[in-house]
Amino acid sequence: MLLAGAIFILTIVLVIWQPKGLGIGWSATLGAVLALASGVIHIADIPVVWNIVWNATATFIAVIIISLLLDESGFFEWAALHVSRWGNGRGRLLFTYIVLLGAAVAALFANDGAALILTPIVIAMLLALGFSKSTTLAFVMAAGFISDTASLPLIVSNLVNIVSADFFKLGFTEYASVMVPVDIAAIIATLVMLHLFFRKDIPPTYELARLKEPAKAIKDPATFRTGWVVLLLLLVGFFVLEPMGIPVSAIAAVGAAVLFAVAKKGHGINTGKVLRGAPWQIVIFSLGMYLVIYGLRNAGLTDYLSDVLNELADKGLWAATLGTGFLTALLSSIMNNMPTVLIGALSIDGSTATGVIKEAMIYANVIGCDLGPKITPIGSLATLLWLHVLSQKNMTITWGYYFRTGIVMTLPVLFVTLAALALRLSVTL
């Protein structure tokens, strides 16, 4: 147990710290090699772990490539400018619409896409409107927060969702039928908390005339138009083809390939830059990190957590839902959500929970790992990258400020979201 734990801690430190620019994939690989060399894991564990991660990572990469291509075409800036006009010069309405745009982008393009793509666009738009630094910070924090809290509804909305759905063999429609209503509750709770927390920083009015026409944001009309078609077909494909046994990754890959072909033909987008910007290291990272996690499982860590979950299960649906969600949220905030989701899944699988109680734990694990990372900067890799992007835009958010904001914002939203899950599973739709 001690050796497996030491290897895990070393791996997490390297992944978060990234000394001398060491990629997350290589840090995780080092951890996996150490685990294999020390006997913490075995050769036979590699295909088992690969079976857990391949579909998730392939889907994630395809979705991010689609989002990068659409970003280069001007799709997201066009959308942001439109919702800004819907605000009709009223600051609170603009704030609400930006948050709802972030929720929509997170649902369709994953939380990473929402945070990293929308943030620079929102900053540029707010600068054009002449907003103060405190107002800009409020909007940026809101965009970053909603990208995670609203990444629940679809399997493709978060890498955590894909990993968990693959592990427990959850179908796309089955997952969405539970989590779409839960996500709506999360969005409402997030909106309320954001308006309360940043109420003094949101201006009463803004000048619409300062914003450029949305049409001027479109840089590649062909890719822009094709993007709408691809998104529609992807959603249809996810709901129709996935139940037939076609992997979500294959459906997403076809969509990415079609959009990429259109973008390459148009010459308006540097497709090579897009490919280089795709998160290829996530494949190596997921395999390496999850091999390290499997070492913790082999050492018996997940057995301890299974015992805790068994006690929660004995207390009923609400205790199982809230207990699992808050436990995995805490673990995610301390040791990152990617390792936590697999630890949670293995622990749930090893518990004696059955029926709706086990189902509640599965979805609560996802919620905890999606929302928990908002408590601390190290909760997710996307947050660390997001903070880096902000620093490049001369917006430095200290870890202390992030934690103070995160803890106040996250806990109420997490409670409401988990309560919505318990209510959803209490009724048969």
Swiss-Prot record:
Transmembrane stretches, start-end: 24-44, 46-66, 98-118, 121-141, 178-198, 228-248, 249-269, 274-294, 316-335, 407-427
InterPro entries: Arsenical_pump_ArsB
Domain of life according to the entry: Bacteria
Chief subcellular location: membrane
An example Gene Ontology biological process: response to arsenic-containing substance
Subcellular location: Cell inner membrane
GO cellular component term of the entry, any: plasma membrane
Record keywords: Arsenical resistance, Cell inner membrane, Cell membrane, Membrane, Plasmid, Transmembrane, Transmembrane helix
Annotated membrane topology: Multi-pass membrane protein
Molecular-function GO terms, alphabetical: antimonite secondary active transmembrane transporter activity; arsenite secondary active transmembrane transporter activity
Entry function: Involved in arsenical resistance. Thought to form the channel of an arsenite pump.
Family matches, as PANTHER family: TRANSPORTER ARSB-RELATED
Official protein name in the record: Arsenical pump membrane protein
Organism: Escherichia coli
Protein's gene: arsB
